[in-house]
Amino acid sequence: MPRFSLDAVRGFDRAVYVVAAGQLLNVFGSGLVYPFATIHFHLEIGIALSLVGLGLLVKNVSTAVATTVGGYLADRIGRKPVMVAAMAGNAVTLAGYAFVPAIAAAVGPLDPAGAFIGVSALAGATNGLYTPAGQAYIADLTDGAERDRAYSLLKVGNNVGFGTGFVVGGLLYEWAEVTVFLADGATSAVVAVVLFALVPRIHAGQRDVALRDSVGDWGSAITKRRVLGLAALNLCFAVLYAQMQTTVPVVAEAELGLSSSEIGTLFVLNPLTLVLLQIPLVDAVSDWRRTRGLLFSVGFWAASMFVVWLVYLLDLGPAAAGRHPLLAAGVVLVGLHLVARTIGEVLHSPISTSLMSALGSDGERGAQLSMLEVAKRAGFGIGSFVGGVFFDYGLAAWLWPSLIGVCVVLGLGLLTFERTLSPVENGVATEG
């Protein structure tokens, strides 16, 4: 394994660093609310947990739909306008979570659950516009292995912000609960200003193309067999991703008896692992075929699901008199899950994005990356729903071997997909 140095994060265009800093701040806002949103709306506002889950599903669907629009707009009118507009919209919709009870009181037919679902739909829409435009902007400024490193830099920035948000959010939530939602919106407003002022417009879009032709180009970009194949694989990865937000916290609380503050502290392992390993690990596999890096990722995902399954196999139930050693073992297993699934995430996210970027022309890139994001959001929604079904019907112990089965399917799918790629598309440098 090559020794990591700061050279891995040097040499990018200044705009890459500005976008990375902006995403760090934006994801800091997300970290403020991530551990506490479900607690707030279920325990404090009194919305049924199933309806909170429905709101999160609606948000993911809305994000997926908006992502297709965001990718199209990124190609048609340029990356920067879409990025700025999306962040400005986020400032309003994310802050709207603080006013869910007030919205329900002001709009007669709505109860708090309906208001929560409505705000979630709007928040998903504004959030979905940003991702394909931001990823395409970075792709425009980088190529080859440099692009993998740039996406890794974004991931590190995201997770420094996310982990810091956990800590600061805990302090804010104890002081005044709704401040975490207001602060989340405020961070997006700051990012919108930073992008508008400091990021140059390097892609002017393709305004001279007729609407009918534009739609045709967009449709062609996202209906290519390999694009759809990679999107399907990404959906399966996202089903695995979703468990950290939906079912793993339930295991930690209901099975192991951890408090919300203990769960939040334990979950810091996710961003901590990302910050420590994202750039050196991706740099270490940069000479591999991209599909082999993704296979390596699948191995860690499978291991992460297995260690949670052990909580059930070893009957590490809620703490009771005399069961403290078993409780400690259960906490270690959940911690191992978080570390292993995060290593899987470290490898998957930048490599899959680079692979999709390599499958089309510059004009198709925004739409293709939007397809990747749509698949991820769909997988999040499916993973959350399916995980909830297993728990609701008393089959929680069987969720984890089922997810290991998903990992097996992913591995076979990647080996099949690899056969369709040229060496250059798969990240292998050729001499010439």
Question: Which residue ranges define each predicted feature?
Answer:
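Helix-to-loop junctions at the C-terminal end of transmembrane segments
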Residues: 66-78, 277-290, 391
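Juxtamembrane intracellular "pre-TM" segments in multi-pass secondary transporters
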Residues: 1-13, 200-233, 432
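Short amphipathic helix-loop junctions that connect adjacent transmembrane helices
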Residues: 35-50, 246-262
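Cytoplasmic helix-loop-helix junction between adjacent transmembrane helices
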Residues: 119-160
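Residue-level signature of mid-helix packing/kink "hotspots" within the transmembrane helices
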Residues: 60-68, 162-163, 271-279, 380-381
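A membrane-interface helix-boundary motif in multi-pass transporters
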Residues: 173-186, 389-407
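C-terminal ends and interior cores of transmembrane alpha-helices
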Residues: 88-109, 300-326
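Cytoplasmic membrane-interface "Motif A"-like loop-to-helix N-cap segments
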Residues: 76-87, 287-299
